[in-house]
From Swiss-Prot:
Gene3D superfamilies xrefs: 5'-nuclease (3.40.50.1010)
Family designation: Belongs to the PINc/VapC protein family.
Native organism taxonomy: Bacteria, Bacillati, Actinomycetota, Actinomycetes, Mycobacteriales
GO biological process: negative regulation of growth; negative regulation of translation
EC numbers on record: 3.1.-.-
Any GO MF annotation of the entry: RNA nuclease activity
UniProt-listed CDD domains: PIN_MT3492-like (cd09874)
Organism of origin: Mycobacterium tuberculosis (strain ATCC 25618 / H37Rv)
Pfam family, one: PIN
Protein name: Ribonuclease VapC47
Length: 136
């Protein structure tokens, strides 16, 4: 299972320099039987990004993309974990993404993000990360 935060989902909804490589990488992962997920937070943030920056018709495209993902709920235990997970420099919404991914830790093969703080948090908790197309 691949977890995608909002920085990754945005690249699938709005063309950015990493979009092509991310799509290619996801296609390869899908060919190996990998499913993808985000959290309820990722769903909300993605729809807000499209509302703010998207072109006509992108709302429907975003809904189609999100319908193809497993949407992980933000339960009380997830929110509780978000209060303490990762380094102190991790921002609140990033901590929620990290805690949401922890729900699927056993199945998690990669956490896809382009956020440097979140990458650091992922590594601190032992998640494998991917940022296809990113220059590091």
């Amino acid at each position: 299972m691949i977890y995608m935060d909002t920085s990754a989902l945005t690249k699938l909804l709005i063309s950015e320099p990493e979009t092509t490589e991310l799509r290619t990488w996801l296609t390869a992962q899908s060919g190996q039987g990998e499913d993808a997920a985000t959290s309820t937070l990722g769903r909300v943030e993605s729809m807000r990004v499209v509302a703010r920056y998207g072109q006509p018709g992108q709302t429907e495209r975003a809904r189609y993309l999100l319908d193809g993902l497993d949407i992980l709920p933000l339960t009380e235990p997830v929110i509780g974990l978000a209060e303490t997970i990762g380094p102190a420099t991790l921002r609140s919404l990033d901590a929620i993404h990290l805690a949401a991914a922890a729900q699927i830790k056993r199945e998690l093969t990669a956490f896809v993000t382009y956020d440097h703080r979140l990458l650091s948090g992922c590594r601190e908790v032992g998640f494998v990360t991917a940022s296809p197309g990113a220059v590091r």
